[in-house]
Structure formats: structure tokens, C-alpha cells
């Protein structure tokens, strides 16, 4: 319309689209992840989870591991296992206390250096996107972008509740999310403001398989600009019993 505005039709929201059964959603995510050279694992109990991690670390001959912070990783408390396997762990630094709750520059530099020196980066994710087999990482998961991109091997852990069907659903959830998807933002719908007083989440990264590039001769090379190996481990609720 000339001289005016036209209201575009809204895109269909996830709640309007047919619901995909949870098991089918998981199968689709794993199939799409495999299609882009990722590796899917399922941990049905704590012993299975530790076995999967042990196998990955041994096969990659890892010595140094960079670990991000998020609620799932905190609940799992993987540090004792990693130490028992002889890993040198670098965990995203905790917030300070008292009058200075900000993470210092020296701590940030130290974690960045450790991430680039690590063989394996272990992170949580915000969502596992079934439509494309993508892992969705935001700046709400502290250290996830460094530890998912700098080491040559990325290991991501997620729960069934973090599986989403479509990009529309991811964007809808992010628009109302607090510091993590399960925590609503107190500043209202449509805001990307964090719910913990630490400011907005500044970025969202969609990790779809391994890093890959090709030159003019169309020779595909993996792992040049990021991890050449990506693992996604489903952590079932029975891992906590």
C-alpha cells in the first residue's frame, strides 16, 4: 500500500502446529544431527553417561577439557569423573561475591586460553532443534560459546525437555526466556533481558554439525574454523536417580 503500512501475517507459532510425539522428535533430531556428521548418544543412567564420556575422552586422547556452566552441568557435577580420568579441567569461573560480583578480566582470559588449549569442550545447550539437528547455545550458558567453538571436539549435553521441533519454536521460547529456558523473564514477554540481573543475553548460536569449509577446488575440510567432531548426549531423568 502506497503511503501507508501493511500488516504482514504472523508466522505460525509452535503451539498452532501439530504436536510431534516426543520420541519422534528425538528420532528426528538424532537423524538430522547424524546427517550433518554429528554423533548422537543416549544416557539412560549415570553409569551409561560416564561410560559415554569416558569413551569420547579416551578416543580423542584428551588431556585438557573446558567446561561451561549451566544448570544441567551443575546438577551432574562431572568434575570428579573428569579428574578421575586424568583430565585437566578448566571450568567457566563463578561470579564473584560481596561488592564485586563481576567475573574479572584475568579469569576470563584464563578460561579463553584454556579453551583454545583443550581437546574437548563440554557444554550444556538451551535447545536441541529437531528440524535441523542443531544445538542452540546462548550467552546465558556461561562459557558455552568458547568451549563449544575453540576445542576440536565439542560434547553437548541436553535433556528431553530441551528438544524443540522448529526454528519458530526456538525464537518463541527465546523471546520470553529468563536466564535459562525453564526460567521466565521477569521483565516481560518479548524481552531478551536476563532474569538474574546480569544484563541481556547478547547472542544466540546455532551449531549444526561439525565445522566445515571448502576451497575453490571443492575439497571439503572439517574442523578448520571450529570443532571437527560434535557429540550430543541425551541425559535421561534416570541419570539422576
Feature locations, PLM:
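The feature marks the mature, well-folded catalytic cores of soluble enzymes
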Residues: 1-181, 197-241
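Glycine-biased, low-complexity coil/linker segments
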Residues: 188-196
Amino acid at each position: 500500500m502506497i503511503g501507508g503500512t501493511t500488516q504482514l501475517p504472523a508466522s505460525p507459532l509452535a503451539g498452532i502446529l501439530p504436536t510431534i510425539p516426543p520420541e519422534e522428535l528425538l528420532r528426528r533430531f538424532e537423524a538430522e544431527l547424524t546427517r550433518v556428521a554429528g554423533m548422537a548418544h543416549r544416557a539412560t543412567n549415570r553409569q551409561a553417561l560416564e561410560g559415554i564420556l569416558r569413551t569420547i575422552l579416551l578416543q580423542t586422547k584428551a588431556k585438557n577439557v573446558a567446561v561451561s556452566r549451566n544448570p544441567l552441568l551443575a546438577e551432574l557435577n562431572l568434575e570428579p569423573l573428569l579428574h578421575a580420568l586424568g583430565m585437566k579441567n578448566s571450568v567457566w569461573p563463578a561470579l564473584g561475591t560481596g561488592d564485586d560480583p563481576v567475573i574479572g578480566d584475568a579469569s576470563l582470559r584464563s578460561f579463553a586460553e584454556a579453551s583454545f588449549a583443550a581437546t574437548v569442550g563440554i557444554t550444556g545447550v538451551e535447545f536441541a532443534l529437531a528440524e535441523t539437528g542443531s544445538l542452540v547455545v546462548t550467552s546465558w550458558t556461561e562459557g558455552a560459546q568458547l568451549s563449544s567453538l575453540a576445542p576440536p571436539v565439542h560434547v553437548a549435553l541436553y535433556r528431553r525437555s530441551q528438544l524443540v521441533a522448529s526454528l519458530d519454536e526456538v525464537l518463541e521460547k527465546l523471546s520470553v526466556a529468563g536466564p535459562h529456558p525453564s526460567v521466565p523473564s521477569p521483565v516481560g514477554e518479548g524481552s531478551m533481558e536476563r532474569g538474574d540481573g546480569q544484563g541481556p543475553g547478547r547472542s544466540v548460536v546455532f551449531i549444526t554439525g561439525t565445522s566445515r569449509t571448502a576451497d575453490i577446488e571443492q575439497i571439503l575440510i572439517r574442523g578448520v574454523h571450529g570443532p571437527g567432531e560434535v557429540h550430543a548426549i541425551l541425559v535421561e531423568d534416570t541419570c539422576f536417580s
